[in-house]
Regions:
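Phosphate/NTP-binding elements of NTP-utilizing enzymes
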Residues: 1-149
Length: 151
C-alpha cells in the first residue's frame, strides 16, 4: 500500500477541518483555495476508515444544479480516490450517479438540489457526511432542511 502525505495535498487554511468534532463545517475560501479538493479528500478518507473496519457507510453529495454534478463533485471524489490510491476499490456509475466500494457497498450518492422534494424519496442509511457543494448558491433552504431530516 502506497503512503500519501495528506499535509502536502491540503491547504493549511483547512487543517482545522480535519480534526473538528463539530457536526457542521463551513469551508470558506475564494476560487482556487482548493476547498473542494480538501473536502473530497476528507470524505474519501472518512469512508475508507469505516471500510477498513468492515463497515458499510454512505456519503451524500449535493449541488444546486444537477447538470454540473459530474464535472464538479463527482470528478472531485474520483480525483481524491486517485490521490489516495483507492480508485481500483470502487465502481462508478453515471445513471444513477454513484461511486460504490465493490466489497462493502459503501457509496457516494450525488444529487442535484434543483428539486428539494426529490431528496425526500431517496432512502439511504448509514450516512456519515453530507457535502453541499457551493452551499451559498442554493436557491432554497428547503434543500438543507430536507436533507437533514432524512439523515
Amino acid at each position: 500500500m502506497q503512503t500519501v502525505q495528506l499535509s502536502k495535498e491540503i491547504n493549511p487554511h483547512f487543517y482545522d477541518m480535519w480534526t473538528t468534532d463539530k457536526p457542521y463545517i463551513v469551508c470558506k475560501g475564494g476560487r482556487g483555495s482548493f476547498k473542494s479538493s480538501v473536502i473530497s479528500l476528507k470524505l474519501v478518507t472518512m469512508m475508507m476508515k469505516y471500510i477498513q473496519q468492515g463497515k458499510t457507510v454512505n456519503v451524500i453529495c449535493i449541488r444546486e444544479n444537477q447538470q454540473y454534478l459530474r464535472d464538479s463533485v463527482y470528478n472531485q471524489i474520483l480525483w481524491a480516490m486517485n490521490i489516495l490510491h483507492v480508485s481500483n476499490e470502487f465502481q462508478t456509475r453515471v445513471s444513477p450517479m454513484t461511486i460504490r466500494h465493490t466489497l462493502t457497498g459503501s457509496t457516494f450518492y450525488f444529487y442535484g438540489a434543483n428539486d428539494p422534494q426529490k431528496l425526500k424519496s431517496n432512502i439511504v442509511g448509514n450516512i456519515i457526511a453530507v457535502w453541499f457543494e457551493e452551499f451559498a448558491n442554493l436557491k432554497n433552504v428547503d434543500v438543507f432542511d430536507l436533507s437533514l431530516i432524512h439523515i
